[in-house]
């Protein structure tokens, strides 16, 4: 249904800024992107799952806010995250 602990730790490992980093915007955006990708695949099979679609919209909105924050604070890190995740802007 969701990401398991192994998948989360792999994502955190790829995007963290320091050895103990789990909450930086880059890590949060990467985790949200993985959940969004998982839900997108879910909707290819379950087209009528409107309740989960609402959750997807909330995740996309949350990711957008984090991306906007990162863009305001450090454009270089923002560009790096977008390129690494393949998010269009």
Curated annotation (Swiss-Prot):
Name this polypeptide is given: Small ribosomal subunit protein uS15
Disulfide bonds: none
Gene Ontology molecular function: any one: rRNA binding
GO CC list: cytosolic small ribosomal subunit
Keywords of this entry: Ribonucleoprotein, Ribosomal protein, RNA-binding, rRNA-binding
Source species: Halorhodospira halophila (strain DSM 244 / SL1)
Protein role: One of the primary rRNA binding proteins, it binds directly to 16S rRNA where it helps nucleate assembly of the platform of the 30S subunit by binding and bridging several RNA helices of the 16S rRNA.
Family recorded in the similarity comment: Belongs to the universal ribosomal protein uS15 family.
Taxonomic placement: Bacteria, Pseudomonadati, Pseudomonadota, Gammaproteobacteria, Chromatiales
């Amino acid at each position: 249904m969701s990401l398991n602990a192994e998948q989360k730790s792999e994502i955190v490992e790829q995007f963290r800024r320091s050895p103990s980093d789990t909450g930086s915007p880059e890590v949060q955006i990467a985790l949200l992107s993985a959940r969004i990708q998982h839900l997108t695949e879910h909707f290819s099979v379950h087209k009528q799952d409107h309740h989960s679609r609402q959750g997807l919209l909330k995740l996309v909105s949350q990711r957008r806010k984090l991306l906007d924050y990162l863009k305001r604070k450090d454009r270089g890190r923002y560009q790096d995250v977008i390129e690494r995740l393949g998010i269009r802007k």
